[in-house]
Amino acid sequence: MKKNIDQTTVKSFGDEWDRFDQSSLPEEEAEYVFNKYFSIFPWHILPENPIGFDLGCGSGRWAKLIAPKVAHLHCIDPSSALNIAKKNLSELTNVSFLQESVDSFSIEKESQDFGYSLGVLHHVPDTSLAIKSCTSKLKSGAPFLVYLYYDFDNRSPFFKFIWRVSDLFRRMISIMPPRLKHVFTDAIAFFVYLPLSRISKVLEKSGVRVDSIPLSFYRHNSFYTMRTDSRDRFGTPLEQRFTRKEIEKMMESAGLKDITFSEETPFWCAVGIKT
């Protein structure tokens, strides 16, 4: 059976997190972005001393904030980034690490009280199958939070056009050697992300709504985050995008109900409850 994994993409992420291990990420900024993702997460339905998993944990930046809130957290990643996560989370005693892929991670089925996968499952060949693999590990009534790249279904055609142009650059940059790839993605962060985000910040302070400005999401972020996300966006070989309806359909097909979407950036972030 063909595995639901793209090894070139896995290797790319290992390189990314080795370079951007998040040690330079300000704590307050990490919490700000964390709250963006978890604003819709139903903490109140978790049982006492919950056990869950972080699928595609990367450097462990979200696990670092989740682990203190739960009894145990499984950090799962198929790439060498897991070594970075082990280092970053070394002071936490309630975390375990599994260097495994989404279609074969060894957690027992129907054993977890919650799960999440943020910015990961759009980088596997079959996203729908990957979501099903995640939900198979959940107990009935357990929440699953996912963040998948949106297909600009809530944006103007202009956004879609910009993405199509940028995707041409991604296809070229993503096949470059690591060092050259970093040069190009850092340049994009400096000449594209930084100006647009700072212009958005100035306009917002003047009372202007900036949601329609590309990359305005980064107006409160550091240049370090921009470099990280530029590397993620332009340096990754496999990328898929989905509409809200497509994500909802995949989640329902995976046995999730009461699906809720965040109406704020980043899009789309959704949570559902295992039936």
Predicted regions and their residues:
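N-terminal, positively charged/glycine-rich alpha-helical extensions of SAM-dependent methyltransferases
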Residues: 1-32
